[in-house]
């Protein structure tokens, strides 16, 4: 869990910043993260 949290936290911030440029791309990356964590 520790590794996932360390990776997911900055990635989430990056995704939120990316969301400003392209909402669809942000949603796609979130789906990828959810798939990997499942």
Curated annotation (Swiss-Prot):
InterPro entries the UniProt entry points to: Orf10_SARS-CoV-2
Species: Severe acute respiratory syndrome coronavirus 2 (2019-nCoV)
Name of this chain's protein: Putative ORF10 protein
Quaternary structure note: Binds host ZYG11B. This would not play any role in SARS-CoV-2 infection.
Organism domain of life: Viruses
